[in-house]
């Protein structure tokens, strides 16, 4: 059975980049009636935190990316935290050493740094120089007796080519002579990503690895490990990374935020999944799609090879589409029961139908609740100046028109047009700003029907001051 996976490191909060990777793996699995697996890669003992681990899982559940295998689900191939799998890795280290496919390396970080510097100055790509590759058993024991703790390096075969078919990028070829022997166990005994990631994919039955293109150069190394251990090899697909509008790595200065921050600010999960699913993947439909619909239209061959640019406005577009399609009960659960309680029952339906198409976040709902039912508006300086420039007569005539015609906006506007000889923006804008504090928004005629007559009178009088 097809099985994809998402394997984050709990060293920080989930950001848009790894949320997108998780989503693509989820959609890929669902499109093939496969299994979506979650594995926590927490071998970085110093930086891994349980709070981040739980936060990552919470974010995935909030996005409705439920895993069928992993922590809290089917744990048949577990444990799914790499920190609990060291004995498994140790067994494979022993197999490699016994087959002379791995060897101890006693080089210090300073020695390695100097070696890389010399290679770069000679115009060569930095790779391990093989200093410890041919140490005899006696030399190894002597160094250990001196108290030196070795790392373990994989012995990369000379003069070979590692070839694999990437589902996104086509055939990939890597010369082993350019790779160099690499570390598969640190000197402190812990396992780096390169090794345990490959081992776990094989042992957990992962058939497809869909990950960022920054892992592309890891793949030949992991293939060499799996082939040496005669373990099954997954199919790989390396997706383009998200970058900022200027083409540089995505960061907060581009408007990127973590999933928790987006959630706390009122973004909805379906808005994020619709935006991220289209970030480097083509969908024929430009409608808001459910996760099932996104999965049905997902095709790994439709993934872009080029970096994809983050666009905060596009994310907000999908947020607005999602809010507009929320059932009423879900809308108020999202906006908050406190806001709902401020709306008179007899005006709740009209308020919702009037305001809903014009809001994207709970703070927007709060604004229009205050417009319709609050006592004061906080005008911006430019708005106050516009009202002063309009002159008191406009608002005095508007006051009288509302007294005469009630909440019939068409009659009020006709009265102003006749009395003041106005048309266009000078006719409509001062009235909208005086009553709502905004230059744009929901249909003014409907807002007026929601407002108390006293509120309308008070705001027109305030505009005269």
Curated annotation (Swiss-Prot):
ATP binds at residue 252. It catalyses: tRNA(Glu) + L-glutamate + ATP = L-glutamyl-tRNA(Glu) + AMP + diphosphate. A motif ('KMSKS' region) lies at residues 249-253. Keywords: Aminoacyl-tRNA synthetase, ATP-binding, Cytoplasm, Ligase, Nucleotide-binding, Protein biosynthesis. Pfam families: Anticodon_2 (PF19269), tRNA-synt_1c (PF00749). PROSITE patterns: AA_TRNA_LIGASE_I. GO terms for biological process: glutamyl-tRNA aminoacylation. It is an enzyme of class 6 (ligase). A motif ('HIGH' region) lies at residues 8-18. Belongs to the class-I aminoacyl-tRNA synthetase family. Glutamate--tRNA ligase type 1 subfamily. This is Glutamate--tRNA ligase 2. Its EC number is 6.1.1.17. It is found in: Cytoplasm. The gene is gltX2. Disulfide bonds: none annotated. HAMAP family: Glu_tRNA_synth_type1 (MF_00022). One of its GO terms (molecular function) is glutamate-tRNA ligase activity.
